[in-house]
C-alpha cells in the first residue's frame, strides 16, 4: 500500500514510519526539513511545509492513505494556533490530492473520563500541554463535520510518552471515546505499539469517520 506520513521524523511519526516500512508498504515520509530521514529502500523522503498547501497536495497525490502525525512542538508558545492552522491545511491538501483515507494522530485530552468530563478537564492534566491538547480537541470537532474524506482520529493512551516507550509488544486493546485502562487502572501504551495500532488500521480500516484509542 502507498502511505504518505506527515511529520515522519517526529516521535510518533518516525515510529509509524518504521512499522509500516517493516511491513513492506511504500512510504512517502514528509517533514519540514530533511535530516533525520529513513534510508530504507521502500521510503521516499520529502521536505515540504504543511502550510504550503499546493506543494503538499502535489506530494500527496497517488497515496492510498495519508497519516498526519503533525505537531508543531509541545514547547512552541504558539502551538494552539500553529496546530489548528497546519491541521486544516493538511486536510485541504489531502482533498486536493484526491486521497480519500486520512488518519490523524491526535491527543488523549479529548477522551472522556465519564459522560461529561474529558481528560483535559481533569485537575491533574498538565497545564503546559493544555494549549496543544485543546487544539487537537477542537480539530476533532472540525473533522466530525468532514464528509468528503474517510477520516479517522486516533487518541493515544493517556500515558504515551518517552517514559512509557522503548518496547514493541504487538499487543493492545481498542476503544472509542474513553481511555483503555489496564488492571491497575492506567491508560498506557508505548509509541512502538501506537505504531502497530496505526499500521493495523491502515491495513484493516475499522474506524472510518470515527475517533478511536488503544491501550494495554
Label every model-predicted segment.
Residues 75, 109-114, 159-163:
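Conserved catalytic-site region of short-chain dehydrogenase/reductase
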Residues 172-189:
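A conserved pocket-lining segment of Rossmann-fold NAD(P)-dependent short-chain dehydrogenase/reductase
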Residues 3-23:
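N-terminal Rossmann NAD(P)H-binding glycine-rich loop of SDR-like oxidoreductase domains
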Residues 146-147, 161-170, 201-210:
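Glycine/proline-rich active-site loop of Rossmann-fold NAD(P)-dependent oxidoreductases
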Amino acid at each position: 500500500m502507498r502511505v504518505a506520513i506527515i511529520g515522519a521524523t517526529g516521535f510518533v511519526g518516525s515510529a509509524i514510519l518504521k512499522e509500516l516500512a517493516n511491513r513492506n508498504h511504500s512510504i512517502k515520509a514528509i517533514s519540514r526539513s530533511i535530516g533525520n530521514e529513513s534510508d530504507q529502500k521502500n521510503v521516499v523522503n520529502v521536505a515540504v511545509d504543511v502550510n504550503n498547501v499546493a506543494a503538499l497536495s502535489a506530494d500527496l497525490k497517488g497515496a492510498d492513505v495519508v497519516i498526519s502525525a503533525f505537531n508543531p512542538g509541545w514547547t512552541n508558545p504558539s502551538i494552539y494556533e500553529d496546530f489548528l492552522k497546519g491541521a486544516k491545511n493538511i486536510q485541504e491538501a489531502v482533498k486536493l490530492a484526491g486521497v480519500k483515507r486520512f488518519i490523524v494522530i491526535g491527543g488523549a485530552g479529548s477522551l472522556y473520563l465519564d459522560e461529561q468530563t474529558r481528560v483535559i478537564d481533569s485537575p491533574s492534566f498538565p497545564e503546559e500541554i493544555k494549549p496543544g491538547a485543546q487544539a487537537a480537541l477542537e480539530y476533532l470537532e472540525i473533522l466530525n463535520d468532514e464528509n468528503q474524506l474517510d477520516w479517522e482520529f486516533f487518541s493515544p493512551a493517556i500515558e504515551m510518552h518517552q517514559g512509557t516507550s522503548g518496547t514493541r509488544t504487538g499487543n493492545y486493546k481498542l476503544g472509542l471515546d474513553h481511555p483503555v485502562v489496564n488492571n491497575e487502572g492506567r491508560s498506557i501504551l508505548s509509541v512502538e505499539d501506537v505504531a502497530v495500532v496505526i499500521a493495523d488500521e491502515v491495513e484493516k480500516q475499522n474506524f472510518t469517520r470515527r475517533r478511536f484509542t488503544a491501550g494495554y
